[in-house]
């Protein structure tokens, strides 16, 4: 190593050409490299690839090739210690000598032999402010999970180098800080549907249960507040709905549940435990040792249920997950993709997985594998947010679906559907009174009860079972 910190390329292990890459990963590397070569030193590139597509593999190989071809060092920024460790491990597998800069690291001198650094954003920011870290000859900064805004505070220290942001969703976590303010180019990788069709990701089947969200409040971050979510999802009716959805669509499958509050998750734990199911709870308060034990239990238990809050949306990879339950609503497209992506890993015995949506998220964002115009979202994020369906509009489109266990009680009835909205519009077009529609609904319910009852008392009991159908 020379005095100015330039790396001697002969020091880099060139006997290994890196790991085998999938064709779409190699194509992405070529496109990103082309963009980086074309741009000036202070221009930045954003790379989009779905969760499960191997973003860490791609930027680790980019790091290896960049160091080898330029003689400059690479800095990789993460916001979670789990991602920090995973990235460092992957770089090592690519024969890239690297150093983790976390809270345990108090200083870094310039006379180190590392060719790459993996840093926690807050730690690095503090050490740079304290002038306890010297990072000379950095030619490329890679930002993992680049849609988080916490990384922006570090950009001022690297104004003369290229920055490569990596994310599954090129949409900022804050509407006030769009990503196109910091990145000039967007490179779009393989789509979810393409990765599914080529068997790189599992195919999702989504079940959506309609939920009234009119009590939820939106916070300053643009998403639903924890407090209002706890009030909705912590009540008995929603806990009962969650268990019913699990039993209808996921019973006996390894299931990961996402919540928007710790109290809700503990409630989920208690409810499932009381019903006799194997379940564990996980949040950021759990010790590292206990967390390892819980995740090992989850890995080894075929029908395990894990209820969680926030902690497993990034930096967690358990390919054997068979069902994802969204026991929350979100207005964050990034979070929506992150949560569902936790079930998308392929194994030799798993090519499909289920998604149970209890937050109207499907109606808000569409199917997980549906086409998305990422260029439009990157260039015009405000318009994207403006075009999102409101909860009121979503709920006006709801059509009641009778649960399977209730449908069995009305098995003798061929027709159980009555579109109240369509019937109302039809009645109005004929100049009829709205009571005509109510009468039709009563007639239909009466007919269903008579068809499936042995006597009057049975019919009355069946009528009580239809209370949800009447309310919805």
Predicted regions and their residues:
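Walker A/P-loop
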Residues: 39-62
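Conserved Walker A/P-loop ATP-binding site and its immediately adjacent core
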Residues: 57-58, 67-93, 262
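Conserved helicase ATPase core of P-loop NTP-dependent helicases/translocases
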Residues: 85, 100-111, 129, 266-270, ...
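Conserved helix/coil segment N-terminal to the catalytic DExD/H
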Residues: 105-137, 148, 152
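Conserved RecA-like P-loop NTPase helicase motor core
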Residues: 122, 140, 284-378
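Post-DEXD/H (motif II) to motif III coupling segment of the RecA-like Helicase ATP-binding lobe
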Residues: 147-206
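Conserved interdomain linker/interface between the two RecA-like ATPase lobes of SF2 helicase motors
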Residues: 185-259
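C-terminal helicase lobe
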Residues: 300, 334, 344-461
């Amino acid at each position: 190593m020379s005095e100015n910190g330039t790396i001697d390329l002969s020091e880099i292990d060139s006997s290994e050409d890196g790991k085998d890459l999938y064709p779409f990963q190699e194509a992405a590397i070529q496109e990103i490299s082309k963009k980086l070569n074309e741009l000036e030193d202070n221009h930045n590139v954003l790379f989009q690839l779905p969760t499960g597509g191997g973003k860490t593999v791609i930027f680790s190989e980019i790091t290896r090739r960049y160091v080898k071809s330029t003689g400059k060092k690479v800095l990789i920024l993460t916001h979670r210690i789990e991602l920090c460790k995973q990235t460092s491990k992957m770089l090592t597998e690519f024969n890239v000598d690297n150093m983790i800069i976390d809270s345990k690291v108090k200083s870094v001198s310039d006379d180190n032999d590392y060719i790459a650094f993996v840093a926690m954003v807050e730690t690095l920011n503090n050490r740079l402010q304290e002038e306890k870290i010297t990072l000379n000859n950095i030619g490329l900064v890679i930002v993992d999970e680049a849609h988080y805004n916490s990384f922006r505070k570090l950009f001022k220290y690297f104004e003369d180098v290229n920055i490569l942001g990596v994310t599954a969703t090129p949409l900022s976590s804050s509407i006030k800080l769009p990503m196109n303010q910091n990145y000039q180019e967007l490179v779009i990788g393989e789509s979810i549907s393409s990765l599914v069709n080529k068997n790189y990701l599992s195919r999702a089947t989504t079940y959506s249960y309609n939920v009234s969200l009119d009590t939820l409040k939106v916070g300053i971050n643009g998403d639903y507040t924890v407090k209002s979510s706890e009030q909705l999802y912590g009540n008995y009716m929603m806990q009962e709905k969650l268990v019913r959805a699990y039993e209808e669509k996921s019973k006996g499958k390894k299931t990961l549940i996402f919540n928007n509050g710790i109290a809700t998750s503990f409630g989920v734990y208690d409810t499932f435990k009381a019903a006799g199911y194997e379940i564990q709870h996980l949040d950021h308060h759990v010790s590292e040792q206990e967390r390892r034990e819980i995740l090992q239990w989850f890995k080894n238990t075929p029908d395990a249920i894990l209820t969680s809050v926030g902690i497993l949306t990034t930096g967690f990879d358990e390919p054997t997950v068979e069902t994802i339950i969204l026991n929350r609503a979100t207005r964050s497209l990034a979070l929506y993709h992150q949560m569902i992506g936790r079930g998308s890993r392929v194994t030799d015995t798993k090519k499909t997985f289920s998604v149970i949506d209890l937050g109207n998220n499907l109606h808000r964002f569409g199917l997980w594998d549906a086409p998305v115009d990422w260029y439009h979202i990157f260039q015009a994020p405000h318009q994207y947010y403006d075009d999102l369906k409101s909860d009121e509009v979503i709920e006006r489109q709801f059509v009641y679906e009778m649960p399977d266990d209730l449908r069995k009680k009305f098995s003798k009835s061929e027709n159980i559907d009555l579109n109240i909205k369509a019937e109302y519009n039809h009645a109005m077009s004929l100049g009829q009174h709205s009571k005509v529609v109510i009468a039709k609904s009563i007639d239909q319910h009466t007919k269903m009860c008579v068809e499936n009852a042995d006597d009057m008392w049975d019919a009355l009991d069946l009528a009580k079972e239809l209370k949800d159908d009447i309310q919805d």
